[in-house]
């Protein structure tokens, strides 16, 4: 039974998404349906957690908009995600960045990972 589930899930996994990590700044382009119209909305922020694996994998992006923290959780392999762009690589030492919720201003920034 497990092999059947894995085979079905493997067909539905997306391979066009980049490999990003916790602490990275990403732009997530999401399809939004309003009535009969469909448009693409961008949500930019820091990845504070990734959960599960396989088809059920989710990630949460946090940003501060007008002084209010906004967190949004996306299913990784959902068809509503048009594309994901990595704008900055972050250098962190934790798997979950929940401590950013309590920080304000520059203290809420993540160090940038410099690659050569």
Swiss-Prot record:
Pfam families: Ribosomal_L19 (PF01245)
Gene Ontology molecular functions: structural constituent of ribosome
Entry GO CC: cytosolic large ribosomal subunit
GO biological process: translation
PROSITE patterns: RIBOSOMAL_L19 (PS01015)
Top-rank lineage group of the source organism: Bacteria
Keywords for this protein: Ribonucleoprotein, Ribosomal protein
Keyword Ribosomal protein: yes
Role: This protein is located at the 30S-50S ribosomal subunit interface and may play a role in the structure and function of the aminoacyl-tRNA binding site.
Family affiliation: Belongs to the bacterial ribosomal protein bL19 family.
HAMAP family: Ribosomal_bL19
Name this protein carries in UniProt: Large ribosomal subunit protein bL19
Species for this entry: Clostridium botulinum (strain Eklund 17B / Type B)
């Amino acid at each position: 039974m497990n092999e059947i589930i894995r085979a079905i899930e493997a067909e539905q996994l997306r391979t066009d998404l980049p490999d990003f990590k916790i602490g990275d700044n990403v732009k997530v382009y999401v399809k939004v349906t309003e009535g009969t119209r469909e448009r693409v909305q961008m949500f930019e922020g820091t990845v504070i957690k990734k959960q599960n694996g396989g088809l059920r994998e989710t990630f949460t992006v946090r940003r501060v908009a007008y002084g209010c923290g906004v967190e949004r959780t996306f299913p990784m392999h959902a068809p509503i995600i048009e594309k994901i762009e990595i704008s900055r690589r972050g250098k962190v030492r934790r798997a979950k960045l929940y401590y950013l919720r309590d920080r304000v201003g520059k203290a809420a920034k993540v160090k940038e990972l410099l690659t050569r």
